[in-house]
Amino acid sequence: TPAARFPVEPGERVLDLCAAPGGKATALGAALQGKGVLVANDISNSRAKALLKNLEVFGISNAFVTNEVPQNLAERFEGFFDKVLIDAPCSGEGMFRKDPAVIKTWEEERPEYFAKLQKDILKNGVRMLRPGGKLLYSTCTFAPVENEGSISWILEQCPEMELIPIE
């Protein structure tokens, strides 16, 4: 999972910007070992409720759940977080292998639609990073416009950022 590839230290301030249903958030919360804070956000009210339940079931006590669009959070938490995880909503091409029925629902314009949404999420996620903070961006699609395209775009917008390879 993306959370398993994102080193989090106890005491850090961590944001999971697209957190529901909570698998990534519970892993991040466990890594914090009760120290620091985890903000787990999802824009869907019903998904945020499921997220809250999962964090409670796993006993993550230093987390709170928000149900906000990224721009609203960025206005309140500018430069606040040490780490920001964005497992962005996407066109889902990576699900084709797991669920062939997904292929039938795919539409040609979906990657462009999601790339636009991802850029907005990325822009606001970066705003919430403290100087020197780290952001991990992931999707479950193969569409270059949603992966390399979104990363190239944010690096152009934020020249102070650098790409760090993950092994």
Regions from the language model: what does each represent?
Residues T1-E167:
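S-adenosylmethionine
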